């Protein structure tokens, strides 16, 4: 699956008057892919970003594994609570902190930081798409991790899978190849 050409979004701060959710995407939710158009078209900002992890190609979509020690929080069924958790950690993750590699064989995974307005409306369809069912067995988990966007480090939600993985490890950290 190849993305179509979609320009980066940068809108003015007036769009951020209400609560927003920060989401790191690395697969079919990236700009130019059909799921982006369906679920993220209302994004108020999209920027290139990276996270430490391992990216696997599962064919039609990728899976991300992140180091357990980088997980700041686990997503819930309450978008308002998740916005509050994100804000809490944003106050404690220094914006200019070095994005140091965790112990182990982790790679930088490349994707996009997407800022979505109205989390109460935006998160439930994304959770459904990703098979995230808080408190139940789920295909993906939504977790809060530090991401690097330019020279800034900030917390963002990301959908991760727990192994074992049957796909091919993408050591270059990009999907599709």
Feature-to-residue mapping (PLM):
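Glycine-aromatic micro-motifs
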Residues: 2-177
């Amino acid at each position: 699956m190849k993305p179509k050409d979609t320009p980066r979004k940068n809108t003015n701060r007036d769009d951020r008057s209400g609560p927003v959710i920060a989401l790191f995407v690395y697969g079919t939710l990236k700009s130019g892919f059909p799921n982006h158009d369906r679920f993220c078209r209302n994004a108020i900002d999209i920027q290139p970003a990276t996270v430490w992890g391992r990216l696997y190609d599962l064919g039609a979509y990728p899976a991300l594994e992140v180091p357990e020690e980088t997980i700041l929080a686990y997503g819930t069924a309450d978008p308002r609570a998740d916005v509050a958790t994100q804000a809490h950690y944003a106050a404690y993750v220094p914006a200019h902190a070095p994005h140091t590699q965790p112990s182990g064989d982790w790679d930088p995974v490349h994707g996009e930081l997407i800022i979505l307005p109205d989390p109460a409306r935006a998160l439930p369809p994304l959770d459904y798409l990703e098979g995230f069912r808080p408190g139940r067995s789920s295909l993906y988990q939504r977790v809060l991790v530090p991401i690097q966007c330019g020279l800034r480090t900030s917390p963002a939600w990301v959908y991760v899978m727990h192994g074992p993985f049957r796909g091919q490890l993408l050591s270059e950290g990009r999907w599709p190849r």
